[in-house]
Amino acid sequence: MESLTQYIPDEFSMLRFGKKFAEILLKLHTEKAIMVYLNGDLGAGKTTLTRGMLQGIGHQGNVKSPTYTLVEEYNIAGKMIYHFDLYRLADPEELEFMGIRDYFNTDSICLIEWSEKGQGILPEADILVNIDYYDDARNIELIAQTNLGKNIISAFSN
């Protein structure tokens, strides 16, 4: 399993890492959505990473956690980016009622926080993003789950 670990000393570095990550994802053309699972405790920096990704590729507005709305949609550079937060999800079947599978059948990017709440409904992740924090610093580990995930990690080295 290919992986990459990055030390993130502060918020600025998290935003910069997010920008690079998004630039890599935007260059990929796929038949289906690129699935990115964002893992970490409350306050670990999942939404901050997402903000860095979105603002780094041109989103001008606020980026808020979709804790209450379940999903926030962004159309940037001709690509749909969906940011899901499943923290408040009581039952994975709720995802079926909202038509979740429609989000995954296009050339889009799906960033999913608390993916374990959608177990059995969500497709396999292409890449896992594990965020651990220590005081103000973070460690981000990217773990490839598919060949596409391996390509994403390889692109970080270029």
Curated annotation (Swiss-Prot):
User: What's a single GO BP term from this record?
Assistant: tRNA threonylcarbamoyladenosine modification
The answer to whether UniProt assigns keyword Metal-binding to this entry is: yes
Q: Which residues bind Mg(2+)?
A: T47, E113
Which residues bind ATP per the record?
Answer: E11, G43, A44, G45, K46, T47, T48, D136
The answer on whether this UniProt entry bears the keyword Metal-binding reads yes
GO CC entries: cytoplasm
Record's keyword terms, sorted: ATP-binding, Cytoplasm, Magnesium, Metal-binding, Nucleotide-binding, tRNA processing
Q: What are the subcellular locations of this protein? A: Cytoplasm
The principal localisation class reads cytoplasm
Q: Which GO terms describe its molecular function?
A: ATP binding; metal ion binding
* Any Pfam family: TsaE
Q: Which SUPFAM superfamilies match?
A: P-loop containing nucleoside triphosphate hydrolases
Function of the protein: Required for the formation of a threonylcarbamoyl group on adenosine at position 37 (t(6)A37) in tRNAs that read codons beginning with adenine. Is involved in the transfer of the threonylcarbamoyl moiety of threonylcarbamoyl-AMP (TC-AMP) to the N6 group of A37, together with TsaD and TsaB. TsaE seems to play an indirect role in the t(6)A biosynthesis pathway, possibly in regulating the core enzymatic function of TsaD. Displays ATPase activity in vitro.
Q: Which family does it belong to?
A: Belongs to the TsaE family.
What protein am I looking at? tRNA threonylcarbamoyladenosine biosynthesis protein TsaE
Recorded source organism is Haemophilus influenzae (strain ATCC 51907 / DSM 11121 / KW20 / Rd)
